[in-house]
Each structure stands twice: as structure tokens, then as C-alpha cells.
Amino acid sequence: MCALKGFLEENFYTYSVAKGNHSTVYEFILLGLTDNAELQVTLFGIFLVVYLASFMGNFGLIMLIQISPQLHTPMYFFLSHLAFVDFSFTSSVAPNTLVNFLCEVKSITFYACAIQVCCFITFVVCELYLLSIMAYDRYVAICNPLLYVILIPRKLCIKLIASTYVYGFTVGLVQTVATSYLSFCDSNVINHFYHDDVPLVALACSDTHVKELMLLIIAGFNTLCSLVIVLISYGFIFFAILRIHSAEGRQKAFSTSASHLTSITIFYGTIIFMYPQPKSSHSLNMDKVASVFNVVVIPTLNPLIYSLRNQEVKNALKRIIEKLCLAVK
């Protein structure tokens, strides 16, 4: 991390000074969601409650999976990592946003901004591929239940998760380094409530065509690749469910994928809205609204979606509560 800091600061300084005829920017100021002081206090309270709910929901789900032997399956192994990524995703933005709600000047250094961008992109990419891995897991469980243990062994699960984290960090690092090659001068005001690539590119005073093309290609590629895996998996699942003769069997097969399908629809919908679109049609104000939903709401909803619609999770939670009640008595 120190090496990354040194590279970013040195590269940013060298490139900005080389442009000349401009005052170099070393920190940024966020406009936030609103300039209304009373509304900012209200938003602080809302964001704090939602962030704490995200923490309790996601880490509660992780702990429940860890201490419940009946949940020690590939599906819940992936779900525990999705919960971790969800909370990390929110934590890359929410703490700084909460502080800014209470500050008159919402400033941040270039280094801190770069770290936030890198973490944000890393966890977005991780979530994309985790959702696609979970879709494949549901495909195997429904279409090839007898081969489930053979097709998705423990070692494969670990390799898939490790690959997701490594690839996500690589994409985040590449995008952050590419952003450091931009020159930021004169204006240092970012029209957003956190440091994202899109508003940063809009602020740059150097040529941004390469960076914009890179952002579009990488965002489009990762969204499309993961979405194709999801669509193919659910295509096979859909036809497999149609071949089930009993209504009860169809209902059981569908219920195992319903929560995951709900989560996918919400997440991909906001991602497609936010990133793979041309600059001329991109509204930063609309991006703020989508970002609040993507960064704050979805990571909080996911534990509820997977808990309330999943009988195995509800049964495991019920057993834990019963054990606690017996221990208290």
C-alpha cells in the first residue's frame, strides 16, 4: 500500500506539473448530496442507521453460516463472501460520507481519493463475479443435483473466491493508476458524495478520451461477461424447472434461486444504469441517486433478501435462538 501511495503521488505530481499554465490540485472537495445544512443532518442519521444495519445484517449472516453445520455447503460459502464484499463495498464509501455530512469543507487528499476509488472498483467487480459464480452454483444444484458435490468441490470454491478477489483488485488498481495519469488543475470540486471514476474524469483538464474508453470497455466487459454467465445459468435453470411435473417440485426448485435472482436484478440494474453509457447521456445528478441505492441500499437489503426468502437460513437462525434461550434459562 505504501508503494502504491508513493507511485500515485509521484506520478500525479510529475504529470500535473508537466502540463504547465495551471495550478496543480493536491486535494479535492466533494459537493455531497445537498448543500442544505438541516437536510445534511437528517441524511447523516439515515446513512448511519442504514450503515449499522448493513454491518449487523452482513456480519450476522456470516456468523450464522460459520456456526451452523447445515449451512456448510458451497452455496452458503459463496453467500458468506457476498456478505463480506457487500459490507466492504459500503465501508469503502459510507464512513467518509458520514464524516462529510458534519463538515463544512468536505476535502480529501489525492492519495485518499485514489484509495477509495481502488477499493470501490475492487468490490464492485468482486460482487459482479460472485453473483455469477452463485448463479452457476444454483445451475449445478438444480440441473445436476446428483453431481453437485463432484462438480463444485471445496477446493474449486476456494479457487473461485481467490480468483475473484485477485481479479477485482487488479481491475481496481489498473483503473486507479490510469486515473493518476490525468491532470487535475484549476477546479478541485467533485460533483458527488464520494470519489468515483466518472466524476473524477469529468473534472480532469487533460485529454480524457483514453481513460473514458478504458472505463467503458472495462466496465462493459466485466458487466457483460458476468451477466452472460448469469443468463446462461438461469436459462438452464428455467428449462429444468419446466421439466419438473409436480407443482410442489417446481416451487421448491424456484425458491432456492428466488433470493439470488432478486439480488441480481437489483444490482445489475443499477450497475448498467451507472457505468456503460456515453458521456453525452450521463447525468452526474442521476448518478448520485443510483449510487446511493447501489452503495448504501443494496448491501443492506441483501442479507434480508437471502434470510427472509430462504428456509434453511431461517431454520438455522431459529436453532441458534432456541439454543440461546435454553442457555439463558
Curated annotation (Swiss-Prot):
GO molecular function, one term: olfactory receptor activity
Location in the cell: Cell membrane
Its membrane topology: Multi-pass membrane protein
Transcription among keywords: no
Chain segments annotated as transmembrane: 45-65, 74-94, 114-134, 158-178, 221-241, 254-274, 288-308
Keyword Cell membrane: yes
InterPro entries assigned: GPCR_Rhodpsn, GPCR_Rhodpsn_7TM, Olfact_rcpt
Entry GO CC: plasma membrane
Disulfide bonds, paired cysteine numbers: C113-C205
Key words of the record: Cell membrane, Disulfide bond, G-protein coupled receptor, Glycoprotein, Membrane, Olfaction, Receptor, Sensory transduction, Transducer, Transmembrane, Transmembrane helix
Segments on the Extracellular face: 1-44, 95-113, 179-220, 275-287
Glycan-bearing residues: N21
Segments on the Cytoplasmic face: 66-73, 135-157, 242-253, 309-329
SUPFAM superfamilies: Family A G protein-coupled receptor-like (SSF81321)
Protein task: Odorant receptor.
Family: Belongs to the G-protein coupled receptor 1 family.
Name this polypeptide is given: Olfactory receptor 5AL1
Organism: Homo sapiens (Human)
